[in-house]
Regions:
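N-terminal Rossmann-like FAD-binding beta1-loop-alpha1 element of flavoenzymes
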Residues: 1-3
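Flavin (FAD/FMN)-binding glycine-rich loop and adjacent Rossmann-like elements that form
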Residues: 13, 34, 38, 57-61, ...
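Conserved N-terminal/central alpha/beta ligand/cofactor-binding core
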Residues: 5-109
């Protein structure tokens, strides 16, 4: 197995974009655990290193609480982690399972025989190389490989919200908070989250409107958001008690974008499926994050809908399978097939890992069984996922006094 990574660390935006926590309602909902598998293996390693706190343990320890609940979250079992602990844990997992990792490498060209993907061209400091592959999984976050392969994708070139996370230190006597309708800054809201070390926070308060497919937008957005970081810090110093002596530790290596293209799959995750809490028979994962819409024209979140703690829904296998006749390619992560209003529900950290794990498992089974990746037996896939610790039905979470404050 080969893994091609553009950055120098695995984890995508979770390490390179400073998305330093798993949101409440993604892996845990109320008294139920929803996502384990690879995600849980990573969290377990990070916890052992002192680099993460599970959501239910965070609440039971009363660390960083009470939260400001103006976002109306009804379940605050957030799992924060240290990006460095994540990087190290991911490296260890790859080494233990014999995965060949290519850091600082781009996948630049697809190789096909007819409609079958058979590998690709990669480029890095060693020049151009070819990797032949029996199966390919696109977890680029932008459906980049799927587009190269000729799979139909939606949202290509669409503009949307971009943000550059940054970390601040020396914050005193303050709790994580959210305040909407803040006109003094481009993001339009106060939004910051705890890091593992007391006094350190991750701030999500910069904003640029651009396209995932535009290098110019990424460049301009990075420059503008980096400038905004200083502006935001000054705003917090002047208006938020506890930030008087705060300073910027660093800014994330890359922007995060909500405007990336997505696969047009055999099935599509829809808002209706979430609102009805559907549990399809071909599900490959379960989760509970609600609907979180950001308008390019307005700051912060514009529409938030949370499920009741303990509720959840399933994600079908068809969202990782191209509708186009492209064989031996599956898609995982935040570019799986969704309608726009459902994107926020399946792009979060743990569920992105879950769909990626399912796509990879399906590819492995299809090779063993001698079938195309899209034609893998669903029962066989689900059995393999469960054997590897994936949850297709919830299991009880350790009890907490309450899920919110």
């Amino acid at each position: 197995v080969a893994l091609v990574e553009y950055f120098g660390a695995l984890g995508g935006l979770l390490t390179n974009g400073y998305v330093t926590n798993c949101e409440a309602g993604v892996a845990i909902s109320g008294d139920k655990i929803l996502i384990k598998g690879v995600f849980d293996k990573l969290v377990t390693r990070m916890v052992e290193k002192g680099g993460a706190i599970r959501g239910y343990d965070l609440i039971r320890s009363n660390k960083y609480y009470p939260f400001d609940t103006s976002r109306c979250e009804n379940d605050l079992q957030i799992t924060p982690w240290d990006p460095e602990a994540f990087k190290l844990s991911a490296d260890e997992l790859m080494a233990e399972h014999g995965v060949k990792v290519y850091f600082y490498t781009q996948f630049t060209e697809i190789l096909k025989e007819g409609n079958k993907v058979v590998g690709g061209v990669i480029e890095n400091r060693s020049g151009r190389q070819v990797i032949l592959a029996k199966r390919v999984v696109d977890c680029t976050g932008a459906a980049a490989v799927a587009q190269m392969a000729g799979a139909e994708c939606c949202g290509v070139g669409r503009k949307g919200s971009m943000t550059l996370m940054f970390r601040v230190g020396n914050v005193k006597n303050v709790v994580p908070s959210y305040k909407p309708n803040v006109k003094e800054i481009p993001y339009g809201a106060v939004n910051f989250f705890p890091l593992i070390r007391e006094g350190d926070f991750r701030v999500e308060m910069t904003r640029y409107i651009g396209s995932e497919n535009s290098a110019e937008d990424y460049t301009k957005g990075t420059i503008e958001c980096r400038r905004q970081c200083q502006e935001v810090l000054q705003y917090l110093k002047e208006h938020w008690i506890g930030f008087e002596d705060a300073y910027i530790i660093d800014t994330a290596p890359t922007l995060g974008s909500l405007a990336q293209p997505a696969l047009v799959g055999e099935k599509k995750m829809t808002q209706e499926m979430i609102l009805k809490r559907e549990m399809p028979d071909d599900r490959i994962a379960i989760t509970a994050y609600g609907i979180d819409l950001h308008s390019p024209e307005m700051g912060g979140q514009n529409f938030l809908y949370y499920l009741t703690p303990g509720e959840y829904y399933g994600v079908p296998f068809g969202v990782v399978v191209p509708k186009s006749p492209v064989e031996n390619l599956l898609v995982g992560g935040k570019c799986v097939s969704t309608e726009r209003d459902a994107f926020s529900s399946v792009c979060c950290s743990a569920i992105s890992m879950a769909t990626g794990e399912a796509a990879g498992t399906a590819c492995a089974i299809s090779i063993r069984e001698g079938v195309n990746a899209r034609d893998v037996d669903i029962g066989m896939l689900q059995q393999a996922l469960v054997k590897n610790g994936v949850l297709l039905d919830p299991e009880p979470a350790p009890s907490v006094e309450k899920y919110y404050v």
